């Protein structure tokens, strides 16, 4: 079961790469067509940027994501309780000891990152460490270690990298649109406009507007099931479903994180760091806590 899941996650990695690079190419084509005079040139440029960004994130994901979230690295002397729990869970999961980080934030949350178990890291907020008891902390850390063991982190890291690149290009395009930075067309261009050019213009605008949303939806599609799997895998490691249930119930009552969390990296956290309401709740990267608890009760 576990090895089948790891194999599926590896296949999903390549599928995600294909989908995200397709979205990236559409945005690049739109930017190139509208502002550079060459849709194909913009497409190539966007793919090159996205590839470099993705490779950088994959091989430096730990440092990049930790820096994005203001995390500081700790050791056995500076944070013994957290360090020992991470050490215990890693030992049970039979993975190398991850690096350990703390985020100075009063909310309760945690996340893991790294492209493979060999270069992974786990982070917890000061709020989580202040509220959770040992059994609950083991449940939370077991959840994050399970993400590492199941290679979920690689999928999330690629999603974070490419979604960020797509959003960056789309925002740049919208800013150029707002400030009137589009390519100038001469009289011959205007007189020679064809139906094809109009279609390309419409496609370019739609790509720029909708690609970030599409990237978010792809992240949603892969994020929710991996949360259920990590909850169950945590119980497999701790042999204590009630500890995980109690931890989730406390997380459900946590306030939003005070420091800014990048939209692309929000999916890495065990609990939604923004606690958004209204229409935004339909774009949660996490399944409802109540549903996660019910699934654990059925184990």
Curated annotation (Swiss-Prot):
EC assignment: 3.4.24.-
GO molecular function terms noted in the UniProt entry: metalloendopeptidase activity; zinc ion binding
Active site (UniProt): 144
InterPro entries reported in the protein's UniProt record: HtpX_protease (IPR050083), Pept_M48_protease_HtpX (IPR022919), Peptidase_M48 (IPR001915)
Topology term for the membrane: Multi-pass membrane protein
GO process terms (BP): proteolysis
Cofactor note: Binds 1 zinc ion per subunit.
Family membership noted in the UniProt record: Belongs to the peptidase M48B family.
Name of the protein in its database record: Protease HtpX homolog
Organism whose genome encodes this protein: Streptococcus thermophilus (strain ATCC BAA-491 / LMD-9)
Lineage: Bacteria, Bacillati, Bacillota, Bacilli, Lactobacillales
């Amino acid at each position: 079961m576990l090895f089948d899941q790891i194999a599926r996650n590896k296949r999903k990695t390549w599928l995600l790469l294909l989908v995200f690079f397709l979205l990236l190419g559409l945005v690049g084509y739109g930017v190139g067509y509208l502002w550079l005079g060459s849709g194909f040139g913009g497409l190539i440029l966007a793919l090159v940027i996205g590839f470099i960004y993705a490779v950088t994130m994959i091989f430096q994901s730990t440092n990049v994501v930790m820096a994005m979230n203001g995390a500081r690295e700790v050791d056995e002397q500076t944070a013994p309780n957290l360090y020992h729990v991470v050490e215990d869970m890693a030992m049970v999961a039979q993975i190398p000891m991850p690096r350990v980080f703390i985020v100075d934030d009063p909310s309760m949350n945690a996340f893991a990152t790294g492209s493979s178990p060999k270069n992974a890291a786990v982070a917890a907020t000061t709020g989580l460490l202040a509220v959770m008891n040992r059994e609950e902390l083991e449940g939370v850390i077991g959840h994050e270690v399970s993400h590492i063991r199941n290679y979920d982190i690689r999928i999330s890291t690629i999603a974070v990298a490419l979604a960020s690149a797509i959003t960056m290009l789309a925002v740049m395009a919208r800013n150029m649109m707002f400030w009137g930075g589009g390519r100038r067309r001469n009289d011959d261009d205007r007189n020679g406009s064809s139906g094809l050019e109009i279609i390309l213009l419409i496609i370019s605008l739609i790509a720029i507007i909708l690609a970030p949303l599409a990237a978010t939806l792809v992240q949603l599609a892969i994020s929710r099931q991996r949360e259920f799997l990590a909850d169950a895998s945590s119980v497999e490691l701790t042999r204590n479903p009630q500890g995980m249930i109690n931890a989730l119930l406390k997380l459900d009552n946590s306030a939003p994180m005070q420091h800014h969390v990048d939209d692309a990296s929000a999916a890495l956290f065990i609990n939604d760091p923004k606690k958004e309401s209204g229409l935004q709740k339909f774009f949660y990267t996490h399944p409802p806590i109540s549903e996660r608890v019910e699934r654990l009760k059925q184990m």
